[in-house]
């Protein structure tokens, strides 16, 4: 699902017929921003999106055999940053941002009709929402807290909504994406705007642990996370420095698949996690230090060492 900038419509593309077919689903005004898509057990399509013209949260589905669009929440300027998920009973769950009140909101039809809830009203919260369901159909939502510049997380797994600040370092939580593994452990990727890093948070150890997993340049915007059948983590994201799409994988123990270095390289140098190349220009003096480069894939790991010293040299002509 996507927004058609020229016609201001919600569009949908699929290759289920064997070739790509595109359809204009909603053409009633300026519609289709912040779109999110999910598929139910019958392979019917469900899409949440923002209606700019009417400032509403809208929803589209083809489960009846043809496309039907519905205004779900019309109370103020609502429906930004939508994310949609389908539970084991094919009920729909949508998280989104209420721009009028600055709140994280949630809508579901699991009772048979749409019920709307304000989950977090503590400041300006709910930007960049991402939703996922666990094996019990409990809801998990990651989002950005604009007031405190934090990554936040909300869940109803205890029977009522509980919100938690996961990462409280400066300017983190942008473009969050959430997924759950086979043990219902939570995994969140997000962008650290202050440092320009891709960050990753998980509670699989029993408490939240956050890690900067790519620090090579300005990386981590527009992140998306997925978990495979072996509980390995897969994350896609933007490399703003090189204008590239990047990918990083972590095994089920949260070890980065690819290259890593320990300790941190001298200021101004960075390691390309895909190629193992060290590049950059040192910006500070550094004593003679040995760095361990580790490369890891599904077959195992290997290491090598490199020694780097940064001295203050007299300029030459």
Label every model-predicted segment:
Residues 313-317:
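Proline-enriched interdomain boundary motifs that mark the N-terminal boundary
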Residues 267-282:
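Strand-loop-strand motifs at the edges of beta-sheets in extracellular beta-sandwich domains
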Residues 249, 282, 295-297:
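Hydrophobic beta-strand positions in extracellular immunoglobulin-like domains
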Residues 286-298:
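A short beta-strand micro-motif common to beta-rich folds, especially ectodomain repeats
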Residues 1-253:
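Extracellular, repeat-based ectodomains that mediate carbohydrate processing or recognition
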């Amino acid at each position: 699902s996507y927004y058609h900038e020229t016609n201001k419509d919600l569009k949908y593309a699929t290759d289920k017929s064997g070739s790509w077919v595109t359809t204009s689903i909603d053409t009633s005004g300026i519609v289709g921003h912040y779109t999110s898509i999910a598929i139910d057990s019958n392979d019917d399509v469900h899409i949440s999106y923002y209606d700019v013209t009417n400032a509403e949260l809208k929803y589209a589905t083809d489960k009846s055999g043809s496309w039907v669009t519905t205004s779900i929440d019309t109370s103020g300027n609502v429906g930004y940053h939508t994310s949609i998920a389908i539970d084991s009973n094919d009920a729909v769950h949508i998280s989104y941002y209420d721009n009028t009140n600055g709140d994280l909101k949630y809508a579901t039809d699991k009772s048979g009709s749409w019920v709307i809830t304000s989950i977090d009203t503590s400041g300006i919260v709910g930007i960049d929402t991402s939703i996922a369901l666990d094996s019990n159909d409990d809801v998990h939502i990651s989002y950005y807290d604009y007031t405190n510049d934090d990554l936040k997380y909300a869940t109803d797994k205890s029977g009522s909504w509980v919100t938690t600040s996961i990462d409280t370092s400066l300017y983190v939580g942008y473009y969050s994406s959430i997924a759950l593994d086979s043990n219902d452990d939570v995994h969140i990727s997000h962008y650290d705007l202050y440092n320009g890093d891709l960050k990753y948070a998980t509670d699989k150890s029993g408490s939240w642990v956050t890690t900067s997993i790519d620090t090579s340049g300005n990386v981590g915007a527009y992140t998306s996370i997925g978990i495979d059948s072996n509980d390995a983590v897969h994350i896609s994201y933007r490399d703003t420095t090189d204008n590239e799409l990047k990918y990083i994988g972590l095994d089920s123990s949260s070890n980065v698949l690819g290259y890593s270095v320990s300790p941190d390289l001298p200021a101004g140098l960075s390691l390309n996690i895909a190629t193992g190349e060290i590049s950059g220009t040192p910006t500070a003096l550094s004593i003679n230090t040995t760095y361990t480069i580790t490369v890891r894939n599904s077959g195992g790991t290997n290491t090598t060492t490199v020694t780097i010293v940064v001295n203050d040299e007299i300029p030459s002509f």
